[in-house]
Amino acid sequence: MKSKSIIAQLLYVLIAFMAVSCVADKSEPCPSGEPTRVSGSIVSLEHHGLRGASADKENSVERLELWVFDEDGHFLERAVADLSGSTFTAKIIPSEVERRIHFIANYELADPSVWVGRSEREMLPSISVADDLETIRMWARISYPSIAPNQNLGQIQLLRNMAKFSLSVTPPAESKLYDASYALYNSWNKGTLAPFDPNTGSFPQGQITEPAGVVFANPTSEAAFKEADGAHFFYGFERDQSNIGTGAGITCLILKARYNLPNADYTYYKLDFVDTNKVRYNITRNHFYKMILKKAKAPGRPTLQEALDGAAANNIFLSAEVQALPAFSDGSGMLTVDHTYMVFVQGEPSGTFQATYIPQGQNNPDYSKLTVSVSTPTGQQAAVTSAQHEGNGKIKLTLAQQENLTKRSDVVIGVQGNPDLKRSVTVLVREKYQYVFFKANTSSAENNQVTTQISAGQGNELLISAKLPDVLNAALLPITFKVYTEHFYPKTGGMILGIEGGKTLYKYVLTTMPQNKELQFRFKSNKVNSAENIAVKMDYFHDQTIHVTN
């Protein structure tokens, strides 16, 4: 058998020198024969209710290569696919016998010729990558009995080679934590393209595969911490944590927050990935590790390093729940909602949001399996008196009457026959938010009114500053800040000129929470007589009026 394998490898090398290329790269090795066009489609494994840069990183396929192996697993050729949306075409040599194809996304094989004739069991495990792109490497392996001209290779479900992490801290009234942010620590600096079991020589999903020579990735600076709102994510490579002690540097999250008071000093908590029985999770590729922190019982460590060096705070200083979900969406199939956090401040009698369920392996939604339930946290009044699915994914909410207190309900969307696949939408009914402070120059507003005197003449400054309350959840973003003025123009960048009701306004769209939740907008007068009443409006907030006098 060994001599046969050596002869086979020599034949592949000989073919590589003699054959013409099967793709645009003329130096590419390939078996003999004329290449044929093949096609296929990439199945999106998950859809996201929260979109943005993270969703692009998770789902983007900017390059797709087909690594073709023979029936014994020896490398034959590499084809680079042409991508068009979720479909692709490529040219490979047809075959009447089995071909194994590894589909590799967002990675370029530098020199395919050096791999000709070598085994897939050697090639795939030996290639490791760092998190050095705006995309994630992905992989799939499919065996085909033969490759015919113009064959459709079918739908390809790609497996990401990284895990995803999120931390959601409940509002300060419940968690006692303010200005909460977090980062991933003690994660490996690289990972393999594909999972591989050396005992069987197979490529099973769920098999943790760590490349040789891994070390911890560079620690995240505090400036790069992300908001702990469940909507900002980190990514890391898989790691077997079943036999490591706490002193070995477990993969963890570090939470930075102020305890009990909004002006308290920051302290730090280490959060371990453990289940309800305090058994540590392995970090597995293409899994989503969702941590929900409900309440802090004490302040954390005074420094980040002390938190890293100390014991995990789960179930000691914190009440936290960890979910390890076997896909970036969680559960089989794709369940999305267009809102995860809704606040009603206008006394509305009802509201709606959209839910969509797409069964695994399908492209069209199935609304018939959606379920809706409503719960109210203990000690709070219900914000939603009823919720029902009106068809086509439209969820109608009947809202409680607005009063001078905050009412809350959690609307849970589920799927019949799939108890692990759920989405929770937090709904609040409350009065409009109040700014912590609202100022025009140095004058502070009272009862949503403020007067400021500005010298007559052009080019004199009006500074509008405001601070958002801690209870304002980042999930409500984007929020639009509007300033209605005829006598001033903005000096702050990013403001958009508009006309509304015949009045000039300048809009600023808030997409991220500002530092310390403080806003500042600088204006200058464009008329000698700049006295006027300026209306300032922001979603969810009481309108403010600035009385400018000269």
UniProtKB/Swiss-Prot annotation:
GO cellular component, one term: cell outer membrane
Misc note: The name (major fimbrium subunit) does not indicate the abundance of the protein, but is derived from the greater length of the major fimbriae. In strain ATCC 33277 and strain ATCC BAA-1703 / FDC 381, major fimbriae are 300 - 1600 nM in length and about 5 nm in diameter. In contrast, minor fimbriae are only about 80 - 120 nm long. This length difference is observed only in a small number of strains, including strain ATCC 33277 and strain ATCC BAA-1703 / FDC 381, and is due to a loss of function mutation in FimB, a protein that restricts fimbrial length in other strains.
Propiece residue ranges: 22-51
Lipid attachment points (N-palmitoyl cysteine): C22
Signal peptide: 1-21
Localization terms from the record: Fimbrium; Cell outer membrane
Name of this protein: Major fimbrium tip subunit FimE
Function summary: Probably a component of the fimbrium tip; required for incorporation of FimC and FimD into fimbriae. These long, filamentous pili are attached to the cell surface; they mediate biofilm formation, adhesion onto host cells and onto other bacteria that are part of the oral microbiome. They play an important role in invasion of periodontal tissues and are major virulence factors. FimC, FimD and FimE contribute to interaction with host CXCR4 and thereby down-regulate the TLR2-mediated host immune response.
Keywords: Cell outer membrane, Fimbrium, Lipoprotein, Membrane, Palmitate, Signal, Virulence
Family: Belongs to the FimE family.
Lipid attachment site numbers (S-diacylglycerol cysteine): C22
Annotated source species: Porphyromonas gingivalis (strain ATCC 33277 / DSM 20709 / CIP 103683 / JCM 12257 / NCTC 11834 / 2561)
Gene Ontology biological-process entries: cell-cell adhesion
One Gene Ontology MF term: host cell extracellular matrix binding
Principal place of residence: other
